A protein has these predicted regions:
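Catalytic machinery of carbohydrate-active enzymes
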Residues: 1-322
Length: 322
């Protein structure tokens, strides 16, 4: 007789990048508890990351309401279940009142900043062996990625947009990186350019899409759900992008990843994994905070990151991952 299912409520982040960085905990729990069944709560933008988990019951998109009623709505959806484990990476009060055998609730700990992967692992007390980000994909998702990337030559994936102008490296510099790496004398000679971004980025990336002949450009901006983007990124030889959810998807996919940083803290948000690099200009995060304390001004903070520095990092990473 098979064992009874072990229901796990997993409450994760609103933002895509944070949700990706916590995703390895589901893989770890699934490996250690074979009869686990997951209900995942995530922000609407990130919820799609968890749709292909093979042993999930529900994915609940969790949209914040100005009056705070979103917590009561979530309570109504989850309160009747007797949970085996509640993992709450938001540290909410709701989790303390649910019926469960065990709880693992995020608590802020004093001390120096630690990476978000380690912070999530600390909630399960596995910070000495943190769970690397991991996303499940269905055979159908993988096949679509195969079809979208069909062709010959290595793929350079670029994600030139970000959720804020301050974190966005100029589009013309991404174009120069593409030319340097994919040129006949470049380390990815004969390769193809893959461009990724959200629906609002379509016009922004147009200059980049014109960098190479059409038959060497795969512009999927605004066309993919998150898991298909993840599956497509598995097929790239190299990823270069701003600090964004796509950067974390690329690193989780195992693709050699270069994250371009300026006014964001790479101690917390560096791409996770051995085949990743952080590239930033001459200023550290604290210097950006000093001139833009709220990190919300309409200022292009990435102007002092030169193309040559990014290309050099790309060449080094390509050599290291041959």
């Amino acid at each position: 007789m098979p064992p009874a299912t072990f229901p796990i409520l997993f409450i994760t982040a609103t933002r895509i990048g944070d949700a990706v960085l916590s995703s390895g905990l589901i893989k770890r729990l699934s490996d250690e508890i074979p009869n686990a069944r997951f209900t995942v709560v995530a922000g609407p933008a990130a919820a799609g990351l968890f749709e292909d988990i093979p042993n999930h019951d529900r994915v609940i998109p969790f949209a914040k309401a100005k009056d705070g009623s979103h917590w009561f709505d979530l309570w109504r959806q989850v309160r009747k279940t007797r949970w085996g484990l509640v993992v709450d990476l938001r540290g909410s009060g709701l989790s303390r009142f649910l019926s469960t055998r065990r709880r693992a609730i995020y608590r802020k700990v004093a001390g120096p900043p630690i990476h978000k992967v380690q912070e999530a692992a600390r909630t399960l007390r596995i910070e000495d062996e943190p769970a690397p980000p991991y996303l499940y994909t269905s055979p159908e998702t993988e096949q679509r990625a195969v079809d979208l990337t069909a062709g010959s030559g290595p793929i350079l994936a670029l994600a030139p947009a970000a959720n804020w102008l301050g974190k966005t490296w100029p589009i013309e510099r991404f174009a120069r990186v593409a030319i340097e790496l994919l040129d006949v004398d470049g380390p990815m000679a004969g390769g193809r350019l893959l461009i990724l971004g959200g629906p609002d980025d379509t016009r922004y990336v147009e200059p980049l899409a014109r960098t190479l002949p059409r038959d060497r450009v795969i512009d999927l901006t605004g066309q993919l759900d998150l898991l298909t983007a993840y599956a497509v990124l598995k097929r790239a030889r190299l990823f270069v992008g701003n600090d964004s959810g796509l950067m974390h998807l690329a690193a989780a996919a195992g693709t050699p990843t270069i994250g371009l940083f300026g006014p964001s803290d790479d101690r917390l948000y560096a791409p996770w994994g051995p085949d990743t690099r952080v590239v930033r200009g001459p200023r550290e995060f604290e210097q950006f905070k000093a001139i833009d304390p709220g990190l919300n001004q309409t200022i292009g903070h990435m102007m002092d990151l030169p193309v040559d520095q990014v290309v050099a990092a790309a060449r080094e990473l390509l050599d290291a991952t041959r």
